[in-house]
């Protein structure tokens, strides 16, 4: 695990096979996370989100791929978009965030979101993205973002969280608890009274403190 960051990943679904996917990778002291939400109710949604994760995994393991150059990620999004459109296997949102020692960069498209929560503010990294434009339509124009090194807690999640919970409640939970506990509470937050979920949920929380990481 990178000594600079701690992270937790949580996935929840009513179904045997979720259409949401999230993974965290490391290259040296750089953390790379990807999150994808296959188009709900469409054939191949899980295949599409899985293809996005697989493309990022391949990029991270390719020594030629410059993970801290945002243009490389823009190009990757376009390659995935074209491949999914050609094969007609489904559509997916996509968020990639790269956390290095000096900066945070990322690329996104669709309605999954990435925020940085600090003590008194919320920085919506994905503000301005094309929420209706998913990978697999063959015309993606991803939004890019760049910030200084992470200060606060990074929250990246699908609309299974953001569509069903208020910003101020999400922020309160993240600020009040360690990230492992916060991840569990965020999933519980969007459960219905029956205990089921209105939608699949995938989320990743990252903090700058070097504590242990967990997968839920």
Residue ranges and their predicted role:
Residues 1-216:
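PP2C/PPM-type serine/threonine phosphatase catalytic domain
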């Amino acid at each position: 695990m990178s000594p600079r960051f701690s992270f937790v990943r949580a996935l929840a679904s009513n179904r045997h096979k979720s259409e949401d996917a999230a993974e965290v990778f490391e290259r040296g002291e750089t953390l790379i996370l990807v999150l994808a939400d296959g188009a709900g109710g469409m054939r191949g949604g899980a295949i599409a989100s899985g293809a996005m994760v697989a493309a990022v995994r391949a990029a991270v393991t390719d020594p030629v791929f410059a993970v801290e150059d945002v243009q490389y990620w823009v190009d990757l999004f376009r390659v995935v978009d074209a491949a999914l459109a050609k094969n007609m296997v489904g559509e997916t949102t996509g968020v990639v965030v790269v956390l290095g020692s000096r900066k945070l960069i990322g690329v996104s498209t669709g309605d999954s979101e990435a925020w940085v929560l600090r003590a008194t503010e919320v920085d919506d990294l994905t503000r301005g993205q094309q929420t209706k434009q998913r990978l697999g339509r063959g015309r993606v124009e991803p939004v890019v973002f760049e910030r200084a090194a992470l200060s606060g807690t990074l929250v990246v999640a699908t609309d299974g969280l953001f569509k069903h919970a208020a910003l101020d409640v999400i922020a309160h939970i993240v600020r009040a608890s360690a990230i492992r506990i916060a991840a569990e509470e965020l999933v519980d937050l969007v459960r219905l009274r029956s205990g089921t979920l209105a939608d699949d949920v995938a989320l990743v929380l990252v903090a700058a403190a070097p504590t242990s990481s967990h997968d839920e």
